[in-house]
Amino acid sequence: MFQDNPLLAQLKQQLHTQTPRVEGVVKGTEKGFGFLEVDGQKSYFIPPPQMKKVMHGDRIIATLHTDKDREIAEPETLVEPFLSRFVGRVQRKDDRLSIVPDHPLLRDAIQCRPVRELTHDFQSGDWAVAEMRRHPLKGDRGFNADLTAFITDGEDHFVPWWVTLARHNLEREAPVMVESALHDANLQREDLTALNFVTIDSASTEDMDDALQVQDNGDGSLLLTIAIADPTAYVDENSELDLIARKRAFTNYLPGFNIPMLPRDLSDNLCSLRPNERRPVLVCRVTIAADGTLGEDIHFSAAWVESKAKLVYDEVSDWLEGSGDWQPQNADIAEQITLLKRVCEARSHWREQHALVFKDRPDYRFLLGEKGEVLDIIVEHRRIANRIVEECMIAANVCAAIALRDNLGFGIYNVHTGFDPALVEQAANVLQANGVEADPQALLTLPGFCELRRHLDALPTQFLDSRIRRFQTFAEISTVPGPHFGLGLEAYATWTSPIRKYGDMVNHRLLKAIITGQQAEKPQDEITVQLAERRRLNRMAERDVGDWLYARYLQPMAGTDTRFPAEIIDVTRGGLRVRLLDNGAVAFIPAPFIHAVRDEMVCSQETGTVQIKGETVYSQSDKIEVRIAEVRMETRNVVARPVV
């Protein structure tokens, strides 16, 4: 009777139009209910039955209803699903398969089936790549996915590596070598094989791409020669290997092993500056004045060199510090090490005065067993030998930035513009509230930024430094010159790691064009997008594998009395994030572990402090002691508790 009633249809349409709607992102919880977050400002409750239609992270449009004075969101339309391609663990019951996504807030199994081309017989515990196919808000009965690739079985000790690489869609293997001969015969190379070049690396390094040699000019100045491996002598632009390297963009360094950008025969052999082997290189020569100033005589050329010694960071540092048993193999090598130390001291002094020097932070290295188990985590402090190489590489990259800018006006540049102009007022307010005079306009200039950084570095704690970091931009890759505020330099273009960075290979080709006087073509902007995206993915992969290994390493210590010194790196509404100083692991301290009465405590990201009854008890950058309360292996989260 009411079926074709136009009045009823009109009423329905009216109700539909009048029902308030909001667009937002679903936030799941471990308790079955969820919230719809709108513009990060307002959130609406989603009851458990309605959460069955959506997934954490989905962007949806929902209708709003009021139930017992509470506004409730009812999911209506899917705008953008959270999951498309994902990795997870397969469950098999009888002959039915489902997959649980590997994500902290996605606990429910999704029904799935392998695509036709996939012949693997999936078992419970297997890891797989999947693609979402069905979603309840698209009119489907439930969630459904296709299994598109088998990653490995659940018993594989190397699950952290294989799953992480699959998650970020990164290569597992080195590229395959194709027949490659030295081809740039028309490039005149000077013979520098008689000079005492040395390499300084870790003991295990095989892909040595830089060698150094210094000559004392006798007037307080030094002539530094930096020789860099020349893979573009073997890899033609747009050749098969070049396209592979362009796609990979970087060698991917993960705990325990690396996946090279170029075939190992090139990276670890033909191009590697091995001792007593004649190698083609690009060379930069520059005079360094007694005060560390780079001379105007920057000169690039192609050459042959022969490294006279493969030196190791710790051994060189020990020798310079007068400790350990190691000795240079002869007086020539000893002289080179001593001269390199002079280069380092002069350049470091110049950069402290005229640019910016990063504070030394330790590196953490996982010592792994044959089954991928973590035997130990070694803290590697940056010592004098590390600083020698760093200063020489920075000098070389400044020289390249100048040569490319003055001769071509383009290249692959690392650019960092300091404060975000939209946030600089807020940065100035935070500084002024903490007793540091700051003019927002001055902070946007390179001298103003450098002056502020030097002031912050001289303060007794890093509290203020960590507070204003969020108002700064990220470093970018650009095809035109621009300042690098983070280094305090007017221009910076890297060319010193062409075996492991594709952008450096591009700069090599441009430098060769300058050397030979040939026409050079400006790199396409698309290449900077690819480099930035790959750098992001590689960093995420390194972090993900690290989190997994930290969880494995710290799990036996959960619930014990073992104490760890830690630094507070972030304050959130829910608690504190800390870094364990002995091993580099990041842990979370939930607010209830800090103080039992929630109403008496304020955890403020705005001020970077935790206050109890109005008193500040913790601040960002504070050093505290913690115990490991729990390690959640399925999410690789470490939960800590402060030692009171």
Curated annotation (Swiss-Prot):
SUPFAM superfamilies: Nucleic acid-binding proteins
InterPro entries per the UniProt record, alphabetical: CSD, NA-bd_OB-fold, RNase_B_OB_dom, RNase_II, RNase_II/R, RNase_II/R_CS, RNase_II/RNase_R, RNR_Ribonuclease
Domain spans labelled S1 motif: 561-643
GO biological process: mRNA catabolic process
Enzyme type, top EC level: hydrolase
Catalytic activity: Exonucleolytic cleavage in the 3'- to 5'-direction to yield nucleoside 5'-phosphates
Keyword terms of this UniProt record: Cytoplasm, Exonuclease, Hydrolase, Nuclease, RNA-binding
Protein location: Cytoplasm
UniProt protein name: Exoribonuclease 2
Protein source organism: Yersinia enterocolitica serotype O:8 / biotype 1B (strain NCTC 13174 / 8081)
The organism's taxonomic lineage, starting at the top: Bacteria, Pseudomonadati, Pseudomonadota, Gammaproteobacteria, Enterobacterales
Gene that encodes it: rnb
